[in-house]
A protein has these predicted regions:
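Charged docking surfaces used in two-component/phosphorelay signaling
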Residues: 23-31
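Acidic, metal-coordinating helix/loop segments flanking the phosphotransfer/catalytic sites
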Residues: 38-57, 97
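Conserved phosphotransfer cores of two-component systems
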Residues: 50-53, 76-83, 95, 99
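Hydrophobic/aromatic residues positioned on beta-strands within the core alpha/beta folds
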Residues: 89-90
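Acidic catalytic/metal-coordinating carboxylates
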Residues: 41, 68-73
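Non-catalytic signal-transmission and effector/linker regions of two-component phosphorelay proteins
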Residues: 1-13, 19, 26, 44, ...
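Active-site residues of response regulator receiver
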Residues: 61-62
């Protein structure tokens, strides 16, 4: 796994309701040099985003409990904080390109670290 340039300067918010999957994603991104914040649902992620200004990438699952899913969260983030890059993931659905905000990327589950890191690089390039 290659470490992206400026990884240490990028804080990632991981939003995943499956504890084991979230822990693995945290480990994967920390191993790649990213600083990571985690949330178990979109509502928790929204509260974190409102209280912090250092999030550079949102890495979110689509299906999760709470008042909004990952698509709704990503759309709200793209509207309110357009500088935050979006990487969306799911093992159950494959969104149409129009469902992913303009500067967002989709990575299907199960994913490998290199797939996620490439998506981060592409999202950051937009």
């Amino acid at each position: 796994m290659s470490i992206p340039p400026n990884a240490s300067a990028t804080r990632v918010l991981i939003v995943e309701d499956e504890d084991l999957v979230r822990m693995m994603a945290v480990d994967m991104l920390e191993d790649a040099g990213f600083a990571v914040v985690e949330a178990a649902c979109a509502d928790e992620a929204w509260a974190i985003l409102q209280s912090r200004s250092d999030i550079g990438v949102l890495f979110t699952d689509i299906e999760m409990p709470g008042s909004m899913n990952g698509f709704v969260l990503a759309a709200r983030v793209a509207e309110r904080w357009p500088q935050i890059r979006l990487v969306i993931t799911s093992g159950r659905c494959r969104p149409a390109p129009r469902d992913v905000p303009d500067h967002g990327m989709f990575v299907p589950k199960p994913y490998l670290a290199d797939q996620v890191l490439r998506a981060f690089e592409r999202a950051r390039a937009h």
